[in-house]
Amino acid sequence: MSRLILFNKPYGVICQFTAELGHVSLKNYISLPGFYPAGRLDADSEGLVLLTDDGDLQNKISNPKYKLPKTYWVQVEGVPTQTAMKKLCRGVTVKNYITLPAKANLMNEPTDLWPRIPPVRFRKHIPTTWLQLSINEGKNRQVRRMTAAVGYPTLRLIRFAIGDYTIADIAPGGWHLLNTT
């Protein structure tokens, strides 16, 4: 039987157990031995990180060939146009590659959203918008690069789900342990 931890990673935490100067790591939150992250999430992003004690499960979660969708709540600067949203849905050019098509929708600000520390910068004359963006790949800083490529920089990024696993009812810094078959 495999075990899986659903961890709601706070802003500023790095996705490794070894501490680095100036960063809080997973070891500050999870003390169970034998668990390793299945994928990563940047220190300046928040939300779901899955950790497991099973190498095969870790591969199935993190390997793009299994096409496990990752769903993000993204606060962007400005109000995206229909053209920008269609580009996200078709795939956009980021550096030297074209991203796979994404599912992208405008959304209301998530309910029960915790405050980010430090807070997102506020600009009185520039509105912000929330998007729900689902992708099946996970290249480094991909969501941030995708929104920037269509003209709307990411201000806050929260991974809400990986496949059917979500951070619903898990406070930042909190985690749930599941037994899987």
Regions found by a protein language model. Name each.
Residues 1-181:
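RNA pseudouridine synthases
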